[in-house]
Design a protein with these regions (language model features):
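N-terminal interaction/assembly modules
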Residues: 1-177
Length: 177
């Protein structure tokens, strides 16, 4: 789970957004949230400072010659704040679905951030369909990893979705497209 190394994001995850919001803005918010969670994990920067830094200097800004996409700032804040607030609930749920002998604190930091953010959305953002949560975070994993990590993200979020939102999966399996 940790041996494939990172690659720079080469593509944007495909986003879908309810309420007429730009799918790209939600996708950009998810990417920024994963980056912020990673930064907090690696540097120990606190929640208030990382959110302020991202909102002032990254979301929709040009950084080192790269243009950051406009992100839905409120959605970004909700994910980052929510992961921090719900981490004691999220981590054991993710741990339960990792391969035997693995714990969340042993996986790669970016993968850990992706899993936490995806689990938060699956648990707390019922306005976002589970299939969208899974697709978005699998696409994010593909942007950072070339190995098995996207499959890990897919498997864990799918299991969480079946546990937390069984009605969505029951509807999907009953004669739909």
């Amino acid at each position: 789970m940790t041996g494939s190394g990172h690659k720079k994001p080469s593509r944007s995850p495909s986003g879908r957004s309810p309420s007429g919001r730009s799918p790209q803005a939600r996708t950009a918010a998810r990417l920024a949230a994963v980056q912020a969670l990673y930064q907090m994990d690696m540097t120990g920067i606190d929640l208030t400072h990382v959110i302020a830094e991202f909102e002032a200097h990254r979301l929709g800004q040009e950084v080192e010659g790269s243009q950051y996409c406009d992100a839905e700032a409120q959605f970004f804040r909700d994910i980052v704040e929510g992961v921090v607030r719900e981490q004691r609930r999220i981590d054991p749920l993710v741990d339960r679905h990792l391969a035997e002998g693995w714990r969340l604190n042993r996986v790669d930091s970016i993968l850990r951030a992706i899993l936490r953010a995806g689990a938060y959305e699956m648990l707390m953002r019922k306005d976002v369909p589970s299939r969208v949560v899974i697709t978005e975070y699998v696409d994010l994993a593909h942007a950072f990893f070339e190995g098995e990590e996207p499959k890990v993200v897919n498997g864990i979020l799918d299991k969480l979705g079946h546990e937390e939102r069984p009605q969505e999966f029951a509807r999907q399996g009953s004669g739909g497209a």
